Amino acid sequence: ILIRHGETDWNRELRFQGQVDVPLNATGHEQARRLAQRLAQEAVVAHHLVSSDLVRTRQTAQPVLGALLPQLHIDNLTDPDLREQNFGLVDGMRVQDIKDQHPDAWARWLCFAPDSGMPGGETTQQFHARVIGALQRLAQQHAGQTLVVVTHGGVLDMVWRTAQGLGLSGPRQSDIPNAALNRVRLRPGAIDILHWADTRHLQGLPAQPVYDQTRLQGAGGAPPADR
């Protein structure tokens, strides 16, 4: 079970969050609470819960762990390899500021080249190798078990691309809402998508910022609200 963290203020402020430690906002906490409630109501069976070590994932994981503990003795582990992509010098910056202060880097970013990244940050290839390697490692360590993994939008994008056999170039092609349920099966050398972007438990909450990479290349560019 893969979960993207709940909403933060930086999602709303349209910043590259990257690996900056940003906490959940009030909506994000409510998303996490509803997610935990749904897992408890569905009596989801899980053996381990793993999150990235950033605060927004740990805060999302906390109520989820509480919902699962009455059923099973599971532990809460953190793994820094599940962090969001490192955007280097632009971590924490608004898109307009990146365009103004790093125009060449921004132009390269809009090409979505796998071997390119923001100054001082990871390339998409490096990011993909890190996060898919981490998930395959966890799957091998806990073979035959169900894991709940709380991570980031960019990580889930890499999972989707891998499962669908897509390359790393080009804009994102999947919806990755905050605190949605995504169910996958990891096999040696492959990932199967079972269910994706299930947000039934979030009905009635404010509309989420949408990370539409296809609009980034348009006039003005719509900023990435998730990463």
Task: Map each language-model feature to its residues.
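Short, hydrophobic/glycine-enriched beta-strand segments
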Residues: 1-5, 150
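Generic beta-sheet signal
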Residues: 137-138, 145-151
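Alpha-helix capping/helix-boundary segments
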Residues: 56, 155-156
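Acidic, low-complexity terminal tails and accessory targeting/binding regions
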Residues: 45, 66, 87-97, 140, ...
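Loop-to-helix element that buttresses phosphate recognition and phosphoryl-transfer chemistry
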Residues: 7-64, 114-132
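Short glycine/proline- and acidic residue-enriched helix-loop micro-motifs
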Residues: 105-126, 217-224
